[in-house]
Amino acid sequence: MEMINIQDLANEVDMSVDRLVQVCIKIGILKTKYDTITQLEKLTILNYLNENLKNSNKNVLMLKRKIRSTVKIFSSGGKNKCISIEIRKNKRYSKSNDDIKTFLEKNKDINLNKSEIVLSAKEDSKIFVSHSKDNINSNINDTCTIRKKFNKNFKKQQKINILSEKEDKNNLDNVLNVEQGSKKKINFKNVVLEEKKENKVKFSNYIKLSEKYNTRKVSNFLTSKNIRDHNNVEKHRRNRNKILRNKHQKDNFSFEKNLSDKNIKLDNCIHKKSIKNKKESLLKQVFKKPLRAINRNIILSSAISIFNLANKMAVKSSEIIKMMARLGYTVTINQIIDQDIAQLVAEEMGHKVTICYENKLEDKIMRDRDFGDGIKKTRPPIITIMGHVDHGKTSLLDKIRLTRVADSEPGRITQHIGAYHIKINNKIITFLDTPGHSAFTAMRARGAQVTDIVILVIAIDDGIKPQTIEAIQHAQAASVPIIIAINKIDKLITNIEKIKNELTKYNILPEEWGGDNIFVNISAKSGEGIESLLNAILTQSEMLELKSISNGMASGLVIESYLDKGRGPTAIILIKEGKLNKGDIVLCGFEYGKVRSIRDDLENEVNSIGPSIPVKILGLSGIPLAGDKIVVVRDEKQAREVATYRQKKFKEQKMSKQRQLKSLDIFEDVKRSSNPSLNIVIKSDVQGSLEAISYSLLKLSNDEIKINIIGKGVGGITETDVLLAAASNAIIIGFNVRADSSAKRIIEFENVDFRYYSVIYQIIDEIKNCICGMLSPKYQQKIIGLANVRSIFKSPKIGVIAGCIVMEGIIKRNSIIQILRNNVVIHKGELISLRRFKEDVSEVRCGVECGIGMKNFNDICIEDIIEVFETIEIKQ
């Protein structure tokens, strides 16, 4: 027997596969959309569909209307009564017999027409009324079969008929007029499509199968025990039909349109409110879950948040958080992670990662620079003077330059890095003067990085000091030669050999001992040995053969930067190679700009400058950081883009580092949450001093007091700085800067703690005092007396009283005591009673007998030792 696929049959009858499977289940054929059926099963399905199509013709249509209103009635008593009135109207519309005849003429081969079904239903109802408990007429089987078939399928066909007649508007050909309330007529347009010949055969076969099926149901009904069971069944059937009819009228008979091509349209004269039929939406969005993991190609350009990384990988953020937890990272959905970690997570989850470098523009702008002819020429040497504080570094430079810079410095100590150049024997030498204070470590490190030769100044009366050792370490790390200048030889102290011996510990050997270091004895006060030192510098520089490119675009290093009140951001730079011209576009760290002015160390305006010459430049967009590299570029727009990108990158790294530190120190923060802290706002004249002050103050933090620098900057104290300090209860520290008029008014109004300083160690000393005042004092117990127990008495009020003699010190009442027996402490308590004979006394001195009463202790023995303590407060 030929087998037919369910999907092919669905295409043949113009029906969805799922709908056809449901039809098969209704008639008892259990199939899925991938199964096949036989010819007999196909015939059964087609008969069922044709039966539904045949019975889709509806004869009766009921319309129900309700009108509610309220009527006010005036009574004689003056009170009004409201009566609710409800008017119900039922309209019944039916088709004429001519329409039924027309339908039957076109379906001659159908064995059972609609009129016969109605008549058989009436006879069937009479038979059911005469049904009794004893016997049942055997003819009921046939009529009940028809009735059951009609009751089951006729209502369904009525629903299908309404929808099919609505969809086929073009084939309406008949209108029925029915008068209102059995007199009015309504026009119907009814078109019956030509049924295919094969559908007629299928329908007749379906009738036979349905009769057999319904006969089985009736036989089950006839076996019911009594009439009451039958009445219950009949009542349930009627209620069910009524519910279905109301539901179908409410849903406007919305069924599959491919089962019929008929439609009904009521005239506008009948309808005051049109019936709105809604079609079932055929467009449905179906989500198909992927069967396997999808690996994507992810492009990572920079640091990225967890949320954005999840969007790129098309996964939930929680999955990435779980993955990072397994890798040992604790993150949140909005936390930013760096490029390396994001790449690791993406590759761990099976995705392919492509790294896109956003600094391509920076690389391009650096490659596009003009390096001139590339010929290197001899350049002046850069000499950095280093040493301990107050060893005479600035005085030595003043003697060489014939200036008096040291006399004008606050506290006679250098706190800024200075850059000068002088001409000796037609040769230029550049000097960098570095601070010697311990706070200026970063300045000394920058000086050692850019220098060619280091002059280490050591005072003959002081010898080797901590900053001397630090300067040696910086110079050795930069691999630059060191010339030792032993200063203050005008003092009658012969300590040179001792200094040489101490320097050997740090690999500094004089030439006469077979080493590479030149030792020169000088006096910055009298000028003795200065000429020898300069000759040693020139000799050492010739040996180094210092050369660089003297033309092309310049590049150098920022030595110091500050904000000039009249000129704006100013940077002291040292050109390493190339030539800097006025009007060049420069890129310096996070800043950029066009060079508006170039000034040398004597404040002379110059148009261009070559290598190894320190100058001041104006025109930058902001204050650069000391130590930033400065280069000349071609395009100002590209320089601005690179500077903006660097700022963005720096902020992302800073935020990521802060979040990481917070997550690592979360438990320590909980412990320290109750500890006090000191908030500070710092404003300085130059960038280097600001860096040194911040570094020194942060080192003062301890376990109990934490130093928080909530704001810092270069320039004068503004209104914004004062408001920040007032809001956070902070101290404002001004180093060689002053507050403007508006800031002074707010300082007085808000009573902000504001302090001026010109010497860095004054800041450190005062902050130390503030921290000591904030620390909680510590207490220490000190032994003030010893007593030996000689006898024991009993008192009804106090208890046991020890008769003692004071052996050392003094015994005071209400002091803390400690009882020792055989040099072992057996009790610690309080002395509550002290008597001399029968008098109460406050203290007893050495060699005097007394009676001592102790609190909550009676186990005292003769020859016990009583130690008396006093609590002393110790300030931190």
From Swiss-Prot:
SUPFAM superfamilies: Initiation factor IF2/eIF5b, domain 3 (SSF52156), P-loop containing nucleoside triphosphate hydrolases (SSF52540), Putative DNA-binding domain (SSF46955), Translation proteins (SSF50447). Signal peptide: none annotated. Keywords: Cytoplasm, GTP-binding, Initiation factor, Nucleotide-binding, Protein biosynthesis. It is found in: Cytoplasm. Residues 387-394 are annotated as: G1. GO terms for molecular function: GTP binding; GTPase activity; guanosine tetraphosphate binding; translation initiation factor activity. Residues 523-525 are annotated as: G5. GTP binds at residues 387-394, 433-437, 487-490. Residues 378-547 form the tr-type G domain. One of its GO terms (cellular component) is cytosol. Residues 487-490 are annotated as: G4. Residues 433-436 are annotated as: G3. Residues 412-416 are annotated as: G2. Its main location: cytoplasm. Belongs to the TRAFAC class translation factor GTPase superfamily. Classic translation factor GTPase family. IF-2 subfamily. HAMAP family: IF_2_B (MF_00100_B). One of the essential components for the initiation of protein synthesis. Protects formylmethionyl-tRNA from spontaneous hydrolysis and promotes its binding to the 30S ribosomal subunits. Also involved in the hydrolysis of GTP during the formation of the 70S ribosomal complex. This is Translation initiation factor IF-2.
